[in-house]
Amino acid sequence: MLVWQSILLFLVGCVLSKSPTNLYTPGYVQCPEGKLTRSSLDGINSNEKAYIDRRYANAKSELSRFLHNAKMVDFDVDGFLNSNPTIGLAFSGGGYRAMLAGAGELLALDSRATNPSVLSGILQSSSYIVGLSGGSWLVGSLASNDLIPVDQLLREDKLWDIQNSLVAYYGVNIVRNTAMWGNINLQVQTKQLAGFTVSITDVYGRALSHQLLTNFDNQGASFLWSDVTETTSFQNNEMPYPILAALGREPNTVLMNFNSTVFELTPYEVGSWDPSLRSFVDTKYIGTRLDDGAPVSKRCVNGFDNAGFFMGTSSSLFNIVLQQLNNMPIPPFLKELISKFTLDPVEKLNIDIAQYNPNPFHKSNNSDTKIAQSRTLYLADGGEDGQNVPLLPLIHRKVSAIFAFDQSADKNNWPDGSALIKTFERQFSSQGDGIAFPYVPDQNTFRNTNLTSKPTFFGCDAQNLTSLTENIYDVPVVIYLANRPFTYFSNISTFKLKYSDTERQGMISNGYDVASRLNGKLDNEWAACVGCAIIRREQERLGIEQTEQCKKCFENYCWDGTIYKGEPLGDNFSDEGLTTSAAYYNSNNVAGINDGGIALVKRDDLSN
């Protein structure tokens, strides 16, 4: 009986899978007509544009509902929405801290939540959702699983089992751990034997899938990132268009915010808007050998874009955790592959690189760049250049407003605005050609004037952006929400690799409180103020004056241009984010500080 059940499950998997092999190993299909690459100068991908147009019909009604519920005063919601304001959600890197805190923030935006917040409906109103590194685990796993609501995910308790690290996923069960790594060994080795280059990211991506793609047969071995377009939520235009961010990195080079090539991994295409590439390739056919975008034969590779591999690419900094396998009984092929990147002094510098061979952009129309000259495309963790909040994909799409959720570990594992600063600075480099990002202050100002302890809006007045661009109305209003403690000390180490269920829930609950401002308890106008930020750029474009309600909101939340020149005052995490004491947030009354959180430096202590 068990044999027939296994056969039936295999056949069902074949039907559901879009991979031609129903395995982790890619296969071959007939090539479509024409080139598989395109120039970024052509604008948004035609399939993406068609999806966003269909999506906006849904998003418009959801945004209308949100704005009505937000009690916008003296504002004609339905008349205004004919102007099509668009929203993008950006979730930062930061390991499981970023995934879990971001999950709570996303839950606060989701109208499907069991306990809706004052911001419920923002997710349904959004056109795009972007994640990098730990944020890619959030975006990638939810999109792959049909945009499952976070609270449903927790109730079902199948995904995001992170009670043990990836290295020993089954805890003390040595037999199951050995079987898991034996299976991963077989999958990666089979891919190599089929003629495809493999790297440590293949191993890491397959391990990561045990936590993020648990609902799929064989932990999503044959589930592709391009398969997201076949999910019910995508087919019904109910999902913000999902994007994962990574960076192009040549071996033995160091990435900076002014020289990196920011790659987008979307269900339709992969590539970059940056001058160092300005090309995209069809996601379905990555792995195909191309010459200036055209297949060199009639057979195209299909199945290379494994969803776990893509999430592993965006978070490849965590490849380093696999060095713990050197002392474990794993198959020789796997041991040799991992040892190459963890023990060899030269290769160890490149442990964070995912290899895409052949390079789809080889000999492309931008052939004078290093990327186009290389036979292998090397991609790395999306946050390695300091732009730890994936803003650029949304800037290129000229959205009206960006929610920037920052879980970075800049100072004592709290954000200090560095991610936004790096993106602001980039626009003045050659790689920043064609982008504009609103003014932001330095890190000292972010921390010491409370811009990380409560939400802050940037780019509030388009007329102040004229020195950055002529197209001032294409610059988004940025709604910045930094990780901070409310009900849990959420500044856990990026490299904390396992969380108990209590810790997991604590992180998610705190993220919910960060986004919702304790579900409106700290400001009963918070939802209205968010609404004011969403509509601001379109109001300016149309010449509509702000209401008195919105003017008051902007006085409370917009950065006013102040630059702090004094001595550091220490962290300030009072409820309001405005007082001079952190007395309410210490190990005696907030959970989590003994789970990896770092104690605060109190302002009142510094003044003594």
UniProtKB/Swiss-Prot annotation:
Cross-referenced Pfam families: PLA2_B (PF01735)
PLA2c domain ranges (all copies): 30-564
Gene Ontology cellular-component terms listed: cytosol; endoplasmic reticulum; extracellular region; plasma membrane
Signal peptide bounds: 1-17
Disulphide bridges: none
Sugar-modified residues: N259, N365, N450, N464, N491, N572
One function term, GO molecular function aspect: phospholipase A2 activity
Alphabetized InterPro entries for the sequence: Acyl_Trfase/lysoPLipase (IPR016035), LysoPLipase_cat_dom (IPR002642)
Role: Catalyzes the release of fatty acids from lysophospholipids. Phospholipase B may well contribute to pathogenicity by abetting the fungus in damaging and traversing host cell membranes, processes which likely increase the rapidity of disseminated infection.
Protein name (Swiss-Prot/TrEMBL): Lysophospholipase 2
Gene: PLB2
